[in-house]
């Protein structure tokens, strides 16, 4: 191997070190930074928070039936009439006008409906709790997408760097092969082999750069801004000791299961509502009205208080059908919960296995790199002594590159698998990850709306926030 080749390699290493030093002043973006940005910038999370607000309002709407209802009405009527009256040929005109104004108040209060209205409120509250769990599920999806985007950009950036380094090495190898050909140490075949390998390296670099550009755009969509200098740790912690512990945590904590548990409760309460449909409803109502003829100053007042009970005798089989339908939906919800538990356990097992595979691949790739590096250095030295051909050097170099690529991919797979295992357990939320983000408390808005039928200041602020996001 020529001295010019070794010198070029050293110059390349020094150049990379200088370039790295120049980038040090730029603050690196960590995975935690990226996750926090994805959480804050996610329109999907904001959308589901709005849906949660809508579900909160359903509780207020249902509770309004337990409160008094007060309505008013008013009207002004102008009447005109004209004609001619008389007899025996004697007639006279008769014209009259009148203006009548009226106003009234009507009040109504539910006295007793055997708990049907209270059940309706409980149904909506359970729906709210289920929607909260759905929001957590969406949050998990947003954050795991951010992990994948961050890790893929790091992986593809390192692969581009490896491809560029490989291109530089093969370029020097080609130059060395030409120098040796000029002095008769190798044949034209050796030069052609190096040229072919150089063309392949350029093609691979172009493909790697294209993959990186795709990863950058996905990062921009998932995180909310273009990637900066990314700084991630190669150390991956195992989020749980063993598979059984992971499954136990997932069954207890996964938001998908909790959401379906609330759905089962909703279905059970809805069945109870349907069973109460035949029960009578008792209401108390009262009204007061005032009517005045403005043209004659005549007036009248009226008022009444009424206690009314109503109930269903026969509706063509509608009520029993509702009961059977609600029972079927309850059964379907229970089966759905069982299926979800099985699916969650399967996802946990799959994620756990993938983490084990990625960990094993990373360890194997490290051994592969050490062996391939020793082989490459040995082949290169032997080639300098004439005991190896250019093809041997190129093949050894390719094996080292493949080993390094395998390690980069294995590290990325291990990182993603670790967080996917967290997600499958239901522990991939901003709160559990300890992200530095504004804490969102769904209970705060719910409490305000539950006791305040009018729009609260919190609701107005959220409306303004959603409008600003819509303008963007």
What are these regions (language model features)?
Residues 1-5, 141-252, 263, 274, ...:
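Periplasmic alpha-helical coiled-coil/stalk elements that build and connect Gram-negative outer-membrane
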Residues 3, 409-472:
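Acidic, low-complexity, intrinsically disordered peripheral segments
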Residues 76-82, 111, 288-292, 311-313, ...:
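Transmembrane beta-strands of outer-membrane beta-barrel pores
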Residues 36-46, 53-68, 97, 104-123, ...:
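A glycine-/polar-enriched beta->alpha junction
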Residues 11-23:
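Bacterial N-terminal signal peptides
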Residues 24-28:
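Sec/Tat signal peptide C-region and signal peptidase I cleavage site
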Residues 81-96:
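Flexible, solvent-exposed loop segments that connect beta-strands
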């Amino acid at each position: 191997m020529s001295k010019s080749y070794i010198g070029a390699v050293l110059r390349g290493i020094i150049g990379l070190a200088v370039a790295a030093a120049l980038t040090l002043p730029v603050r690196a973006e960590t995975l935690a930074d990226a996750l926090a940005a994805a959480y804050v910038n996610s329109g999907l999370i904001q959308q589901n928070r709005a849906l949660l607000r809508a579900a909160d309002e359903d509780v207020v709407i249902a509770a309004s039936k337990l409160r008094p209802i007060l309505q008013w009405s008013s009207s002004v009527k102008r009447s005109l009439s004209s004609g001619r009256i008389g007899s025996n040929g004697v007639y006279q005109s008769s014209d009259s006008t009148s203006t009548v104004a009226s106003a009234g108040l009507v009040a109504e209060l539910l006295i007793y409906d055997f708990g049907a209205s209270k059940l309706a409120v409980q149904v909506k509250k359970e729906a709210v709790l289920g929607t909260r769990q759905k929001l957590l599920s969406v949050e998990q999806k947003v954050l795991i997408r951010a992990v994948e985007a961050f890790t893929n950009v790091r992986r593809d950036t390192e692969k581009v760097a490896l491809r560029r380094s490989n291109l530089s090495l093969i370029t020097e190898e080609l130059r060395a092969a030409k120098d040796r050909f000029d002095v008769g140490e190798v044949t034209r075949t050796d030069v052609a082999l190096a040229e072919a390998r150089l063309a392949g390296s350029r093609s691979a670099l172009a493909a790697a750069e294209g993959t990186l550009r795709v990863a950058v755009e996905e990062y921009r969509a998932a995180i909310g801004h273009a990637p900066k200098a990314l700084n991630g740790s190669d150390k991956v912690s195992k989020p749980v000791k063993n598979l059984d512990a992971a499954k136990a945590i997932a069954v207890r904590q996964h938001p998908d299961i909790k959401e379906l548990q609330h759905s089962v409760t909703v279905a059970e309460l809805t069945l109870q509502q349907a069973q109460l449909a035949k029960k009578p409803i008792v209401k108390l109502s009262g009204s007061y009205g005032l009517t005045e003829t403005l043209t004659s100053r005549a007036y009248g007042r009226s008022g009444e208080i009424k206690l009314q009970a109503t109930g269903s005798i026969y509706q063509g089989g509608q009520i029993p059908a509702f009961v059977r339908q609600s029972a079927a939906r309850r059964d379907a919800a229970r089966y759905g919960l069982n299926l979800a538990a099985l699916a969650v356990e399967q996802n946990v097992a799959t994620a756990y296995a993938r983490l084990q595979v990625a960990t094993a691949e990373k360890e194997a790739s490290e051994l592969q790199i050490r062996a391939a590096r020793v082989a490459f250095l040995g082949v290169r030295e032997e080639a300098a002594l004439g005991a190896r051909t250019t093809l041997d050097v190129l093949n050894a170099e390719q094996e080292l590159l493949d080993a390094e690529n395998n390690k980069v991919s294995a590290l990325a797979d291990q990182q993603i698998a670790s967080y996917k295992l967290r997600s499958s357990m239901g522990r991939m939320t901003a709160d559990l990850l300890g992200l530095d983000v504004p804490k969102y408390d769904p209970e705060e808005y719910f409490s305000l709306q539950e006791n305040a039928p009018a729009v609260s200041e919190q609701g107005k602020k959220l409306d303004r926030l959603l409008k600003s996001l819509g303008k963007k």
